[in-house]
Amino acid sequence: MKNYRIESDSFGEIQIEEKFYWGAQTQRSLNNFKISKQKMPKILIHALAILKKCAAQVNYEFGDLEYKIATSIDKAIDRILAGEFEDNFPLVVWQTGSGTQTNMNMNEVIASIANEELTGKKGGKSPVHPNDHVNKGQSSNDSFPTAMHIATVLATKQQLIPALNNLLTYLQDKSKDWDKIIKIGRTHLQDATPLTLKQEFSGYITQIEYALERIEDALKKVYLLAQGGTAVGTGINSKIGFDIKFAEKVAEFTQQPFKTAPNKFESLAAHDALVEFSGTLNTISVSLMKIANDIRLLGSGPRCGLGELHLPENEPGSSIMPGKVNPTQVEALTMVCTQVMGNHVTVTIAGSNGHLELNVFKPVIIYNILQSIELLSDSVNSFVTHCVKGLEPNIERINALRDKSLMLVTVLNPHIGYDNAAKIAKEAYKYGITLKEAAKKLNFLSEEEFDKIVIPEKMIS
């Protein structure tokens, strides 16, 4: 049989199962928003706990929290950060657009843990009050966007950047010995002039290098924190200097260069920094989609495709075709890319709906951004482990396709002119003969002259 205790808020009393630490406002949110099962991301809860810890420290230093209260709050938060109370943050994304209920969930749980330590009984509002003490000098309107920024930075630094660096390392490692492998290039999915396999992969490498640069550029605005703006940006009920000191505390705790936002009205009413950052994630997914699809095409076959790359064989590919193996890691990564692109559309629409002094699409913005970061990080790591590491060139196939390509004729342009070179290509294609044979047949070049000019190794700069 479940045991219950009574908690209260401005709406009155409400029953809460005794084993949980949350209070009345959290319970009301649970009762009122039974919408799907997408909970607030764990890293956002972690960021909100960091926020409360730093706020309590600043309030104590400003003389606004007595030592016993501040210490009990600090200890409670340390336990939350250590993962002791993960089941006490049950609220879904689909709640108030300011994130107020999740902010109060954190306030109530911290106060409840602290009160249990001080009195032996969880819950209640004394001696530690969720609003008067844990939320002191704060509003959900500045706390939740601050947590959004902290969570985005932490997730990016801990997950996405390492994953992209891992991909970059293995692309560089794989291609370093491919500078002597000359293959045919393709534009419009049609044969083009030659290049080396290393040159082809250098494009992918640069895309990932640029992706990492874009992340650092986009994070510059995400480092700016809204805390101190309180309700509408004026800083009501927050002391002068609280915002600066708070940002310094967060920077010290996280070892990230957080600063207070110069204009709190902007940081409450708009989320342009996160829309921009989501745009960076979108661009990264565009890059990854291109890279993955190229590898898929180059590995197509095994007998009737391009077949220039051997892709690792990880599992059976068909329930009806025996022996079939598919590029499943590519497929997983490209599906993730489409999801991230869709997430960016959501973030864009949500970001554009910051009406007057407060954007009230905050939970859906951060949910989609954090999902994009997680999906990209996990899928890139999987792609590296189960695909990129095992890529091998099919030298025989590469050479065969290169040597019968009609576009080697391009190098003849300076010697016999574009129109005559085009005639050679068309003649070779029409009669199924080599370029050399066509050049001789049309009396443009002898075999010896052709061999001196058409050298793939000299066509790659």
UniProtKB/Swiss-Prot annotation:
Stored InterPro entries: Fum_hydII, Fumarase/histidase_N, Fumarase_C_C, Fumarate_lyase_CS, Fumarate_lyase_fam, Fumarate_lyase_N, L-Aspartase-like
Disulfide bridge positions per record: none
Gene3D superfamilies according to UniProt: Fumarase/aspartase (C-terminal domain), Fumarase/aspartase (Central domain), Fumarase/aspartase (N-terminal domain)
Predominant location category: cytoplasm
NCBIfam families attached to this UniProt entry: fumC_II (TIGR00979), PRK12273.1 (NF008909)
Listed PANTHER family: ASPARTATEAMMONIA/ARGININOSUCCINATE/ADENYLOSUCCINATE LYASE (PTHR11444), FUMARATE HYDRATASE, MITOCHONDRIAL (PTHR11444:SF1)
Name recorded for this polypeptide: Fumarate hydratase class II
Organism: Rickettsia typhi (strain ATCC VR-144 / Wilmington)
Lineage: Bacteria, Pseudomonadati, Pseudomonadota, Alphaproteobacteria, Rickettsiales
